[in-house]
């Protein structure tokens, strides 16, 4: 009768010991390859880095402290940033300080806005709302300030009602704008139709705002005290004058756009040579028919014609508002202008209307104008 072999438990024990050792060796190899991948990026050997990731697709392109995207922004290495985004790097990945790649790009100043900040923002817009351990968002580092729909400040009853109405109006306008865009996208014949122009949209917005303000003024006339009636009428006249100037500037800008489109069409016709005799075409092309419908820097409806110094544009906007003696009315007027020229709002609303190669210059001017308006508002506190 043969006894059971005592080597069986020993073999099982050796197998169980080898398994974690093999797993640890695999993890160690992966970490070495990830370090090699980061060294290739730092040395500018992008082809080697891409080939290494193709041979070992399981590597984590966001591994390391700081992560590779943060290093590329800090070194102003635009090719490495483009390669990392193409390989699937996450712009929302945070380092040990809670910073995302957008935080790192924002700290590099205005020179890094076009090559680093805009590509990261286009890949992951939601990262704009991520705060680091200091409670800062990328927009706050750039000096944009918090969006007005997230500001938490104690105000009196009248200002609170106006802010609530402004947020409601903004939401309705955004919903209506999205609905208009969706209708034109679903319509097969949209090339033969003209969507609502910028001047018509601005006039409609000003008209609805004036009607709303007039209704609120009529409802509140019975409850307001006589000494405040004169100040209210004066503030109302200031608002009407500001709206009239805004509509006039929008009409002038629309006229300039039409002349610019006609001039570009004539230049294009001259490059193609004389055309056979036929009926003269319309000078204004349908929207979306060519690049002539997109804005350049001078086509943007700046507060001053052609743009210029941000401080001068901010001073022009303040000069159109109520006098300095009416602090409350002037603060409300400045809040309206800050919302209108906030970089996030401007980029969301007009990004598709601006030439791509002019986008960085336009957004730089809008950011500077927004910061100048913020300084004027801070001076009134």
UniProtKB/Swiss-Prot annotation:
Modified residues (Phosphoserine): 150
PANTHER family: I-KAPPA-B-LIKE PROTEIN IKBL, NF-KAPPA-B INHIBITOR-LIKE PROTEIN 1
Gene3D superfamilies: Ankyrin repeat-containing domain (1.25.40.20)
ANK repeat positions: 64-93, 97-133
Lineage: Eukaryota, Metazoa, Chordata, Craniata, Vertebrata
Protein's recorded name: NF-kappa-B inhibitor-like protein 1
Domain of life per record: Eukaryota
Compartment(s): Nucleus
Keyword vocabulary terms for this entry: ANK repeat, Nucleus, Phosphoprotein, Repeat
One GO CC annotation: nucleoplasm
GO biological process assignments: cellular response to lipopolysaccharide; negative regulation of canonical NF-kappaB signal transduction; negative regulation of lipopolysaccharide-mediated signaling pathway; negative regulation of NF-kappaB transcription factor activity; negative regulation of toll-like receptor signaling pathway; negative regulation of tumor necrosis factor production
InterPro entries from the UniProt entry: Ankyrin_rpt-contain_sf, NFKBIL1
GO molecular function: transcription regulator inhibitor activity
Annotated segments matching region Disordered: 1-32, 129-166, 186-242, 257-294
Biased composition (Acidic residues): 150-159
């Amino acid at each position: 009768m043969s006894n059971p072999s005592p080597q069986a438990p020993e073999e099982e024990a050796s197998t169980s010991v080898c398994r974690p050792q093999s797993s640890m060796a695999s993890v160690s190899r992966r970490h070495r390859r990830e370090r090699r991948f980061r060294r290739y990026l730092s040395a500018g050997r992008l082809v080697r880095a891409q080939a290494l990731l193709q041979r070992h697709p399981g590597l984590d392109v966001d591994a390391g402290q700081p992560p590779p995207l943060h290093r590329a922004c800090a070194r102003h290495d635009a090719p490495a940033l483009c390669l990392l985004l193409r390989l699937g790097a996450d712009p929302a990945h945070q380092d040990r300080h809670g910073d995302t790649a957008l935080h790192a790009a924002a700290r590099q100043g205005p020179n890094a806005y076009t090559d680093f900040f805009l590509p990261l923002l286009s890949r992951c817009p939601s990262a704009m709302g991520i705060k680091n351990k200091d409670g800062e968002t990328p927009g706050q580092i750039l000096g944009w300030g918090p969006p007005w729909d997230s500001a938490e400040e104690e105000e009196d009853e009248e200002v609170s009602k106006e802010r609530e109405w402004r947020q409601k109006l903004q939401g309705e306008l955004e919903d209506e704008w999205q609905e208009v865009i969706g209708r034109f996208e679903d319509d097969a014949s949209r090339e033969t139709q003209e969507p609502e122009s910028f001047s018509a949209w601005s006039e409609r917005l000003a008209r609805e705002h004036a009607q709303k303000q007039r209704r609120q003024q009529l409802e509140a006339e019975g409850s307001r005290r006589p000494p405040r009636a004169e100040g209210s009428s004066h503030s109302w006249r200031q608002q009407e004058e500001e709206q009239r100037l805004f509509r006039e500037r929008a009409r002038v800008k629309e006229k300039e756009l039409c002349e610019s489109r006609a001039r570009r069409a004539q230049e294009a016709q001259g490059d193609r040579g004389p055309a056979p005799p036929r009926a003269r075409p319309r000078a204004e092309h349908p929207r979306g028919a060519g690049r002539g419908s997109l804005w350049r820097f001078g086509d943007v409806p700046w507060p001053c014609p052609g743009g210029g110094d941000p401080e001068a544009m901010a001073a022009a906007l303040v000069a159109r508002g109520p006098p300095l003696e009416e602090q409350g009315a002037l603060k409300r007027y400045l809040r309206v202008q800050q919302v209108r020229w906030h970089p996030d709002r401007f980029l969301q609303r007009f990004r598709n209307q601006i030439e791509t190669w002019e986008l960085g210059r336009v957004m730089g001017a809008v950011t500077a104008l927004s910061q100048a308006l913020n300084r004027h508002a801070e001076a009134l506190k």
